[in-house]
Amino acid sequence: NELLLNDISNSDSFVVTDSGSIIATFVLRAGEDPTYKEIREGDWLDDGPYATIHRIASDGSRKGIVHLVTQYALAQYDSIRIDTHRDNVVMRNALLREGYRYCGIIHCWNGSERLAYQLIAR
């Protein structure tokens, strides 16, 4: 997959391990994300610099992956943005539990709609 290879070559792809086994993966990228330039039915919490989390995937063997990924991101960046499908209720609830705020709707490069969230370290 070209997208995955690009993430790896840009050093944006990370894994979560447990006892030496990979249990999850995610992308963490600093800087402006083109798909986040326009947001509908809401606004971002601020216009400052941010990092974006993309493509969190877990093997399901452990709960709390969103928490681990968020803590890793917040150790490096003060503002984190993330998006998810409207139907992904599990992810939406996990984001709210972690303190992310719903900000509005964005559209991906392929035109698909996503719900956008932001978390600012306090």
Model features per residue range: what roles?
Residues 27-61:
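Conserved acyl-donor/pantetheine-binding loop and adjacent beta-alpha core of acyl/acetyltransferases
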Residues 12-15, 25, 55, 114-116:
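Short hydrophobic/aromatic beta-strand element in the GNAT-like acyltransferase core
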